[in-house]
Amino acid sequence: IDKLIEYKDKYDTVLLYVSDHGESLGENGLYLHGTPYNVAPAEQTHVPLITWMSPGFVSSKKIDLNCLSEHALNRTVSHDNIFSSLLGLWNVNTSVYNKEDDIISSCR
């Protein structure tokens, strides 16, 4: 993020990070990842999703950061939401875009 901040006055920048899986680090005696989803503990199935946007990006895309913060606290999302969210951020017109899967669309 520090590198993106260096360029915030020159470019509209955004970073979206999501881990592909969680990891059990000894909780309940379990040390691993890859447990079948239906029996996997929350440490393996709940992963961080972090988004950082430069002020110029937020302004150009008309994003309401308060709305995004509210959604972050009250909405559960999954990896399934990433694809349409990225398409929506860049206004890519395609039949595979699903507005319901776009976690940012309701905050624009």
Predicted regions: what they are:
Residues 1-108:
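Catalytic domains that recognize anionic headgroups
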